[in-house]
């Protein structure tokens, strides 16, 4: 459908990954379905591609996506997180982010509700690409109805709305567990009635979610 495809990433993945890859989050899952290669931002691709997929990194939002055009006929930006998250960047980085998504041949967004927003920012082509999860490698034998406890889906930031999730969980008489994401705040460990898990790969996290009676994740998607 798209010909040869490469995903550019902050990770050090090079080449293709298979369906049992332990950290098969959304972008990796889609790369598997497209039989795409991976190339770190710090390296030069080994050849030319029909399509280059860029998820603008949170740690470097002012990167120039046009720099990838020397290796790719088309460049697409893949949305990560809610469409408003870039407004937490510095003013200069916010304008650079807008410039990047306008320069992309198209934007892949999560939901139909995101399409109007990105078009309103001046993007010339916006398409919905749903979140994809691959079941390979998941242990279905551990799932049962005999469970207890609540698992929260994110930390105490505007991105994950962890406080909203916690307040809902706190109204139920069940032990509360939360995940440790990259944006976890140090003060979260001081909350007495939350047990925190260590940082996990995607597959470890999905397996862990299956151990609890209730999951609460109030992350805003618009």
Each PLM stretch: what is its role?
Residues 89-107:
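Membrane-proximal helix-turn-helix segments that form the acceptor-binding/catalytic region
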Residues 209-222:
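Acidic donor-binding loop of glycosyltransferase active sites
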Residues 35-38, 49-53, 72-75, 104, ...:
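Active-site regions of enzymes building and remodeling cell-envelope glycoconjugates
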Residues 1-74, 105, 117:
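N-terminal pre-catalytic "stem/leader" segment of glycosyltransferase-like enzymes
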Residues 76-91:
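A short, histidine- and acid-enriched strand-loop-helix "catalytic/donor-clamping" loop
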Residues 42, 57-60, 110-115, 179-188:
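Short, polar loop motifs at secondary-structure junctions
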Residues 18-21, 134-205:
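Conserved catalytic-core segment of nucleotide-activated headgroup transferases in glycan assembly
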Residues 105-116, 123-139:
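Donor nucleotide-sugar binding/catalytic pocket of nucleotide-sugar-dependent glycosyltransferases
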């Amino acid at each position: 459908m798209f010909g040869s495809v490469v995903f550019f990433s902050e990770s050090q993945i090079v080449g293709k990954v298979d369906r049992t890859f332990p950290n098969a989050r959304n972008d990796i899952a889609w790369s598997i379905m497209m039989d795409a290669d991976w190339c770190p931002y710090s390296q030069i691709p080994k050849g030319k591609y029909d399509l280059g997929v860029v998820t603008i990194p949170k740690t470097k939002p002012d990167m120039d996506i046009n720099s990838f055009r020397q290796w790719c006929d088309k460049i697409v930006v893949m949305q990560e997180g809610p469409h408003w998250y870039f407004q937490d960047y510095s003013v200069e980085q916010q304008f650079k982010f807008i410039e990047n998504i306008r320069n992309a041949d198209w934007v892949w967004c999560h939901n139909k509700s995101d399409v109007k927003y990105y078009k309103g920012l001046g993007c010339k082509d916006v398409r919905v690409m749903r979140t994809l999860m691959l079941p390979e490698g998941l242990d279905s034998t551990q799932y049962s109805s005999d469970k207890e406890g609540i698992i929260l889906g994110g930390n105490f930031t505007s991105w994950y709305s962890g406080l909203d999730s916690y307040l809902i969980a706190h109204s139920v008489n069940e032990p509360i567990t939360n995940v440790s994401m990259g944006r976890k705040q140090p003060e979260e460990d001081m909350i007495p009635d939350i047990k925190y898990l260590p940082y996990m790969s995607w597959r470890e996290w999905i397996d862990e979610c299956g151990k609890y009676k209730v999951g609460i994740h109030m992350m805003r998607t618009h």
